[in-house]
Amino acid sequence: MGTLRKLLNALFLCLWDAFRYDYSYHASALTLQLLLVLAPLIVFLAALSSYLGFIKLDLLEEVLREHFPKQTHAVIAEILKAKEQGKTASLISLLVSYFFSVNFVKKIAKSLSYVVERKKRDVHEVFFWVGFPILLVLFSFVTGMSFYVSILLKTYFKGIGFLSNLASSLPLLFLVISLYWSFIKINRKISLLISSFLVYFFASLLQYIFTLYTVYVFKGSVLYGSLSTIVLFFLWLNFNFLLFLVGARFIERYESS
């Protein structure tokens, strides 16, 4: 019972902190940065996939489609068109894409340092320029592996659907855990795991709610639904970044309680 009380107390305090210190500002900044960097990041990944065979952009697209709300897939499809440019991109455009991508990771680190305050990890500049591509390659590898594992689970364990859903979610869990581990001083691994799974759970719930809403809007008016899709997509991204920052604050609150 003491552990549950500790968890609920940390959860309440991190939500209160998010309201007091207006984490929505940093979530909005991260949303804007991501929109600016998505196309360059995909161009860089497309070029990287030509050298590393296990990087499959099609699998990444499947993961995105599965975890993004329905009716926003058209936005993803437009963004993913940038992958065609990556196959013929010049060295200069690749360097520019890489520069923008690294700056986005720096922005994540800066936002997390604001949220976790005393538990921020001092990261050397070299980490951003060298560690980022390594993280990107690992994320692509985990994406490919989780995709094939989810297919196997669907084939041999048809009655246990949550196993395949969990397997397909591994890339996102891996990414959240990796970012927290890279920029936050973790004293107890249990706090990292609890926080990451809470972020995943509420992100999944958020996706479900947004999917229901977009389906409802499209039923009422296709024109209105089409016009509101992009706005909903931005809003959904913003809420997910807010969850990510609250999850980081949860780690500090849980370990200090």
UniProtKB/Swiss-Prot annotation:
Keywords: Cell membrane, Membrane, Transmembrane, Transmembrane helix. It is found in: Cell membrane. It is a multi-pass membrane protein. Coiled coil: none annotated. Pfam families: Virul_fac_BrkB (PF03631). The chain crosses the membrane at residues 30-52, 88-105, 126-148, 161-183, 190-212, 222-244. One of its GO terms (cellular component) is plasma membrane. The keyword Hydrolase does not apply. InterPro entries: Virul_fac_BrkB. This is Uncharacterized protein aq_453. It comes from Aquifex aeolicus (strain VF5).
